[in-house]
Regions:
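Active-site acidic carboxylates
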Residues: 1-95, 116, 123-126, 155-159, ...
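Gly/Ala-rich phosphate-binding loop of Rossmann-like dinucleotide-binding domains
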Residues: 150
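Amphipathic, non-transmembrane alpha-helical secondary structure
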Residues: 28-31, 35, 111, 143, ...
Length: 193
């Protein structure tokens, strides 16, 4: 079984409060990945309340972003359109709101699917269970979710498509990819510099 996890492809991370040119550049690649993916798709949405600046994250990153039901919180229109087209084609789409970098709920849902697949196919089929992550930001939410999924599913193949991710800076993107490699997360489509 193969799952695609689209991390935080929201307006504030693309062209809003925390947007970057690198984030804008991956949008067409993420759309193509969604359109061509042959499995279930999960997505996460960074979700904060009006009290964001009073939280630990808000004190350490004092930029209001992804405030629930604002335009910045919404998914990028091109990404949302690709997800909708997949759903219209009867592909299962599962969304998770999260108030922190990683989503334990995402990990739990994928762990349940993994256990079900193992009960049907046996332990020898571990390598057939793959999770592919794309999205923003490589050095914050992508790495957090990748490591969380590795903790929930140590025998599953977890892959990050580097061409469909962007970090806060290009250097932090590269550093996050190296950190994930060290934790036995596979990196595909990495551009050598």
């Amino acid at each position: 079984m193969k799952y695609l996890v689209v991390i935080d492809m929201q307006n504030d991370f693309i062209d809003g409060a925390l947007g970057t040119p690198e984030a804008q550049a991956i949008v067409p690649k993420v759309v193509k990945k969604i359109e061509e993916f042959g499995g279930a798709i999960f997505y996460t949405m960074d979700t904060h309340g009006e009290n964001y600046l009073d939280t630990q994250e808000g004190k350490l990153l004092p930029v209001k972003h992804c405030i629930y039901k604002t335009d910045g919180w919404n998914a990028n229109l091109l990404v949302a359109g690709a997800l909708q087209r997949k759903e219209d084609a009867l592909v299962r789409i599962h969304g998770f709101r999260k108030a922190t970098f990683g989503s334990a709920e995402l990990g739990e849902q994928l762990r349940l699917r993994y256990e079900y697949a193992r009960s049907k196919n046996g332990a020898s089929k571990d390598s057939c269970f793959e999770i592919v992550l794309v999205g923003l930001c490589t050095d914050i939410c992508v790495i957090s979710n990748a490591l969380l999924l590795k903790a929930f599913l140590p025998e599953a193949k977890i892959t990050v498509d580097a061409s469909c991710c962007a970090g806060v800076t290009p250097e932090r993107h590269r550093n996050a990819l190296e950190a994930m490699k060290a934790c036995q997360i596979f990196i595909e489509n990495e551009v050598a510099e």
